[in-house]
Amino acid sequence: MAVADDTKADLLKVSILGKESIHCGFHLTPYIVQTVLTTLPSSTYVLITDDNIAKLHLNKFEEAFAKGIEKSAANPKPRFLSHVIPPGETSKSREGKARIEDFLLFHKCTRDSVILALGGGVIGDLVGFVAATFMRGVRFCQIPTTLLAMVDSSVGGKTAIDTPHGKNLIGAFWQPEYIFIDAAYLETLPTREFSNGMAEVVKTAAIWDEKEFTSLESRSAELFAAIQTPSTNYAGRTLETRSEAQKLLLSTIAASIGVKAHIVTIDERETGLRNLVNFGHSIGHAIEAVLTPTILHGECVSIGMILEAELSRQLGILTQVGVGRLTRCLKAYNLPTSLSAPLIASLPQASLLTVPRLLDIMRIDKKNSGTNKKIVLLKRIGETYEQKASIVEDKAIEKTLAEAVTVVPSIPTGNVKGSPGEVRMSTPGSKSISNRALVLAALAKGTCRLRNLLHSDDTQGAVFTWEDGGETLVVEGGEGTLTVPTPGKELYLGNAGTAARFLTTVCALAQPAPASVQPPSTNTVITGNARMKQRPIGPLVDALRANGCSIGYRESEGCLPLSIPPNSFKGGKIQLAASVSSQYVSSILLCAPYAQDANGVTLELVGGEVISQPYIDMTIAMMKTFGVEVTRRTDASGKLLDIYDIPRGTYVNPPVYNIESDASSATYPLAVAAITGTKCTIENIGSSSLQGDAKFAVEVLQKMGCEVHQTADETTVQGPPLGQLKAIEEVDMEVMTDAFLTASVLAAVANGGENKAMKITGIANQRVKECNRIRAMMDELAKFGVHTTEQELGLTIYAVPISQLKKNVSVHCYDDHRVAMAFSVLSTVVEGAIIEEKRCVEKTWPGWWDDLENKIGIKVEGVDLAGLRAESSSAGVKESKPIDNSSILLIGMRGTGKTHIGQLAAASLPGWSFVDADHYFESKLKTGVKDFVKNEGWEKFREEELAVLAELIGLGVDGKAVSSPSSYSKNHVISLGGGIVETPAARSLLKAYLAKGGRVVHITRPIDEIVRYLNVETARPAYEEPILDVWKRREPWYKECSGWEFGNVVVEAPQGQAQAANVEAGPGKTKCVKTLAGRNEVKRFFGHLAGINPNFTHGGSVEGQQRRTYFLCLTYPDVRHAFPYIDELTEGADALELRVDLLKDAKAPEAPFPSVAYVKDQVTALRRVTGLPIIYTVRTKAQGGAFPDGNAKEYKELVEAGVRLGVEYLDVEVASIFSDKEVADLSKRTKKAGSTLVIASWHDWSGKMQWDGEDVKRKYDEARKFGDLVKIVGKAEKLEDNFKLLSFVKSATSLPNSPPIIAINMSTLGQSSRILNTTFTPVSHPLLPTKAAPGQLSFKQIQQALHLLGLLPSKHFHLFGTPIAHSMSPTLHNTGFELLGLPFKYGLLESKEVDCKEVRDVISDKEGFGGASVTIPFKVDVIELLDELTESAKEIGAVNTIIPVHRSSINAQGQEETTRVLVGDNTDWVGIRVCITQRVSEGELRNENTSGLVIGAGGTARAAIYALQDLGVPVIYLFNRTKEKAEDLAKAFVGGADKKWNGQLVVLDKLGGGWGDVGVAPRVIVSTVPASATALPSASTAAIAGQVDKSTNQIVLPADVFAYTSGSAVVVDMAYKPAETPLLKLAKELKEEGNWACVQGLEVLLEQGYIQFEKWTGRRCPKEQVSTRVWEKYGEV
């Protein structure tokens, strides 16, 4: 038997640059080697690949070359060399290129060498560039192993490496001699990688070849099958052995390559035409720069293609048809098409995809011309707008990229020539008719051309082709013959509710798959997105089940996903509840002719009033058009019954079916005309329409005062003058329910008639649409200041004048297209409204925002929500985490203090409230918990308790989402009963909540304290067993049902800390958090957990410069030993590292490591004395720590404890005790929770690690896979080791999305690396017992060294004002500078006016001026010298702090430049605020019975009012010696801080007495007048107490100014000379009540000074020592 020649192969060859050098086939290794050896003679052949590819394919090449060289007649015989490099983008660098070149030089390769690049795009780009430059150019061949490389990077001769400035910025055009496409390699490719490559295949077809694109649209399943079916015995190498799937795959690849090859041949050097292959790449590359390496190139390009196609649509170049086809095609290959795709949205990096960030990245693009961005614009499928990239303005790109929009209020400009403001347009095809037409055409006999089909998320084709550039859909009907999909293939419908309901019955018609299909298919599964899984489908399923179709629910009862058996639609008599959705009725009607019963179907609608009858009539009318007539029965009197007879039969397709424009969509442009007083005509919708919503103009708009003219196929509306719409007293919209949202926004401003209220009825079904639309409209209209009330069948809207609508509202759209479009109508008359989730309109009118601007003529702008939500911090030291407003649950034993902790937590979270589940239970069931248990028993109580829990968190008792979650599921802290974990059902529900991203916190307290408390507590049912037994049973349940723990314990604060707000624990009391420190820890913990005030501090900038960060290593066996010195120890530190492995419990001195319980106590104790972030480290002995390497179980328990305690940073060792999967799971969990960041660390104590070696690169690559930060520690044996470290850091940080890196060398020689490290440098302190590592320095030492190196230049700071000779500010700031080792100096600059030469000279020193304080009398005058003000300074109208900020920007030439801006701020109000909240909690201050008093009306009074408004004090009294000034000041502060305060600002005639009309004595008093302006009452002035003594112009202070006695209260006197002012003296004299805390002016000065210090330096001021010195100095003065 002859042996087949394995070097022979049947190929598809593609020509490029006049040469057939691209060879495509299967199993080509022998052919490649033979071709190279025979046609490219050489002395040396070098194959370069990476570790991953080498394992799969290198051995075969080595064998083939050995065999080929042995047969070679060459003399001497050539050499074959191979070189394997690390995989990944890190190798594609200057250093990586140099290493390959060194290999070639070492092996004495010469110019005749031939290099083979075997691998993906990285290998091809890198090796190609090496070939282009080695010996000034050698021959090379591309052998791509990924589909992406086959169709893209290997073709065209582009070679390049990356640099820190961007990807592919250094390279050359260097054409390979051959490109060998071996499609068999794709069999080893993961499916996701195949999809990655298909993005480029779709791209080439989209820009060049519509025929190929059409093939791609319809044949995705076959292409996937080709790579998922392994070819045995080299099948495919020859035509005889090549399967049809292989032929399709190869022709698809060759066709894509052919497009690019043709373009390259015409434009090799990318002067114009070659730009076209960058379609999708301009935006795609920007996305990739943020998301790499998590998201693949093709996935980013896929999103980029859609966004660039939408950009073309926005510019009026591409129709929605093209966008829709492109979207569906990409989705067919499992590619994401939007930034909200789950693959993208689930990533932590997704929050970085801000519009400014993407636009900034897009600046660096080789297609650009100067500052002009160039993008390839699609004209239609298969053709581009220009034969090159087109210039596009940033504004247009911003609008496309933004996730939200704002409509600029204006009168429409219109699109009718000669008639300004008049609009004539058509809307997209009706969704309702499109969906029905698709089903009818697919089930019918023959061919049907559907025109004006809606191209949207909600319409999908069956068997189809496109005509007229996609304007016409050609459907080949199947006569009812359908087959169950292949196993594992589900029908995913997104949020397409209509499609889901129609297809439920359609799937019951499907026939089982042929026996030849193995494994056999059984049922059809239809599913959708999360929202789709909430929408009801139960009544339809019930009807089909009753008819014999055994449909199964795969998740929640009554919702998708469904499992539908084949051939199960029996027919005959069917009863259906139609009071929820008419779509259930239409689903059965459409399929009825194909039911099995010979007599067809008799459909009877039961269960109350039928909803949306017009849609049922529409279905029947369309069925008649397709050849089947439905009969609706009548009774003897001729009254129509809800019974329908449908005969068996076969639909017959009409040749052409024109789909009406969507009447629901038509309501929006018509409503724009109505609300703006303009004219609009909608074509293709009139009185003959099948759609009920076509009546909207006549039945609603005309009655609201519009002129309406309607023909059979056109509707014209002329609105009344602006503001003259009239409310209809009551309108029944049952025949046009979807249009009620449009009517609602018009009703909101229908203020033109006598009636101001408009009642809309007949819309009950709108509660179960994409969202509860009635509730949605009520909630969102409320944001505009519009009052509504809800009824069973609808709602009533109470109109307000347009001028009174609230501005700058952010509208949440609930992923509902109709909500978004309705509020876009209202936004045409109200400023600043932001429509979130702009893309939800894609369901029915994808181009709405473009049409609103281009056709109607109202400007629409993009809004970057991520940018709006970003925290603004002038110091820039906070890292953001996403804000999550889902409610936080508290669980734990009764008596742990859940209620108290919950109340404090809710009070500390802006906009949050507290709810006690037991109280909610009692209010709902109208009985106390104790009585309920007594009467009904524990089992019944647990059932009701579970129902309450489900209701509060917005889930069903089965853990599934519900359609209308309660308001308690957001922005609430919910305390649950101690026994909530007793039942499996409740535990499952809590775990389901956790799994969905909810927060459940276990509140703990020492069990002995709990026992003491419960032994005397009688309010709730007694336990029926010992408390300790209950605790032991529940403890593991609490742990499994919670994600975090919070310890409610009393920790004695160090000496000097304020012991405010003491609440002693004792019988009947559980408030253990009794100190200010305890309150602060509650605020920190829950603020961090919710993402409202994240406690991360590892990055940022100060004055536009990179801010270095440091952490102090605590090396105590018991951290409580550090508490007396904690303020000094933490000077300069941004975080504390808790070395868990070094902890030693004195009660277990022999234990090799601490217990979990001891560690929890240590963390809890540490939290009470410092709010600094904790770096939680369990260092193993292998990496220089104390934890035994063999105790894996205990190590994992300690790490888990850190996560549960919510530590901000968790140090996890690379190559540690954790397996790769465990590390990945841990990383995934922490990223999902968002409260803990992982520091992936590696410590080499051996000194063998070289910073320029391969080992450190591999460790770094491993660490960056799961670490939010990377820490690598080596050992310096010589000074040069530090230089190598810096080089490594520079290279590592140049990679896209490289995490922050901590890189240091141990030993004394390594100290320079600690000085130069920028992120989280570990520091020690002289007061610590030991250093954590050799070579550690203190923070102060590092600052001094940085100054000597010129990296921390000297700065000068000043105080502007007069008189200022005795100011305490120099002492305050200079003490802080000295303690931290900062080379700064603070001095006085006294002048008669602030705008003088001396001041101008100081502030104009751009290098040396660090900032300034401003005091009287210059706080207002100084504003003229500044560039901008902070919001608080603007509101207060005074500046006490000047901050120089350095900002980078791009100039007109595209160059980066830095400018200095002088920013004016006000820290007085912050100082006042801090002093108040140290004495009275924020929750108490917001209590409705709380009031505050401000004495004075000057600049400081403004700061005091601002502070009280910011705290939410509901009533603020203002008293001044000159009442007119107080009244002027009150007018300036209407609306309060940031215009969000809605309390009362009351100007008093006198202090005390009845406190005006309000009658509430103040709990907070702030005096801003000099001490000399007040006086204690005397015998002669007692009669005028509370008023101004005109003889002295002093305020006589009445005793009842301190009348408040119901709780803690505070008086702040801003004057600090004398120390004891008359106001403070009076407070002390009356202090027998014990509730008034006194604050001297110097304390406020200190607090505001601490804030100044941090804003200038980015460092926390060392408060305790600074305070001590200032008070000493004050005493001297």
From Swiss-Prot:
Record note on quaternary structure: Homodimer.
Keywords: Amino-acid biosynthesis, Aromatic amino acid biosynthesis, ATP-binding, Cytoplasm, Kinase, Lyase, Metal-binding, Multifunctional enzyme, NADP, Nucleotide-binding, Oxidoreductase, Transferase, Zinc
Entry binding sites for NAD(+): 50-52, 89-92, 120-122, 125, 145-146, 167, 185-188, 196
Residues reported to bind ATP: 892-899
Record-listed 7-phospho-2-dehydro-3-deoxy-D-arabino-heptonate binding positions: 136, 152, 158, 168, 200-203, 260, 274-278, 281, 297, 366
Region (3-dehydroquinase): 1114-1341
Cofactor note: Binds 2 Zn(2+) ions per subunit.
Localization: Cytoplasm
Reactions catalysed, as given in the entry: 7-phospho-2-dehydro-3-deoxy-D-arabino-heptonate = 3-dehydroquinate + phosphate; 3-dehydroquinate = 3-dehydroshikimate + H2O; shikimate + NADP(+) = 3-dehydroshikimate + NADPH + H(+); shikimate + ATP = 3-phosphoshikimate + ADP + H(+)
Protein task: The AROM polypeptide catalyzes 5 consecutive enzymatic reactions in prechorismate polyaromatic amino acid biosynthesis.
Record region (3-dehydroquinate synthase): 1-394
GO molecular function per UniProt: 3-dehydroquinate dehydratase activity; 3-dehydroquinate synthase activity; 3-phosphoshikimate 1-carboxyvinyltransferase activity; ATP binding; metal ion binding; shikimate 3-dehydrogenase (NADP+) activity; shikimate kinase activity
Pfam families noted in UniProt: DHQ_synthase (PF01761), DHQS_C (PF24621), DHquinase_I (PF01487), EPSP_synthase (PF00275), SDH_C (PF18317), Shikimate_dh_N (PF08501), SKI (PF01202)
Residue ranges, annotated region (Shikimate kinase): 885-1113
Gene3D superfamilies named among the record's database cross-references: 3.40.50.1970, Aldolase class I (3.20.20.70), Dehydroquinate synthase-like - alpha domain (1.20.1090.10), Enolpyruvate transferase domain (3.65.10.10), Leucine Dehydrogenase, chain A, domain 1 (3.40.50.10860), NAD(P)-binding Rossmann-like Domain (3.40.50.720), P-loop containing nucleotide triphosphate hydrolases (3.40.50.300)
GO cellular component terms, semicolon-separated: cytoplasm
PANTHER family reported in the protein's UniProt record: AROM/DEHYDROQUINATE SYNTHASE, PENTAFUNCTIONAL AROM POLYPEPTIDE
Spans annotated as EPSP synthase: 407-858
Residue positions of the active site: 270 (proton acceptor), 285 (proton acceptor), 840 (for epsp synthase activity), 1243 (proton acceptor), 1271 (schiff-base intermediate with substrate)
HAMAP family on file: EPSP_synth (MF_00210), Pentafunct_AroM (MF_03143), Shikimate_kinase (MF_00109)
Pathway in which this enzyme or protein is active: Metabolic intermediate biosynthesis; chorismate biosynthesis; chorismate from D-erythrose 4-phosphate and phosphoenolpyruvate: step 2/7; Metabolic intermediate biosynthesis; chorismate biosynthesis; chorismate from D-erythrose 4-phosphate and phosphoenolpyruvate: step 3/7; Metabolic intermediate biosynthesis; chorismate biosynthesis; chorismate from D-erythrose 4-phosphate and phosphoenolpyruvate: step 4/7; Metabolic intermediate biosynthesis; chorismate biosynthesis; chorismate from D-erythrose 4-phosphate and phosphoenolpyruvate: step 5/7
Species classification: Eukaryota, Fungi, Dikarya, Basidiomycota, Agaricomycotina
Protein name: Pentafunctional AROM polypeptide
SUPFAM superfamilies, A to Z: Aldolase, Aminoacid dehydrogenase-like, N-terminal domain, Dehydroquinate synthase-like, EPT/RTPC-like, NAD(P)-binding Rossmann-fold domains, P-loop containing nucleoside triphosphate hydrolases
BP-aspect Gene Ontology terms: amino acid biosynthetic process; aromatic amino acid family biosynthetic process; chorismate biosynthetic process
Family: In the N-terminal section; belongs to the sugar phosphate cyclases superfamily. Dehydroquinate synthase family. In the 2nd section; belongs to the EPSP synthase family.
Organism: Coprinopsis cinerea (strain Okayama-7 / 130 / ATCC MYA-4618 / FGSC 9003) (Inky cap fungus)
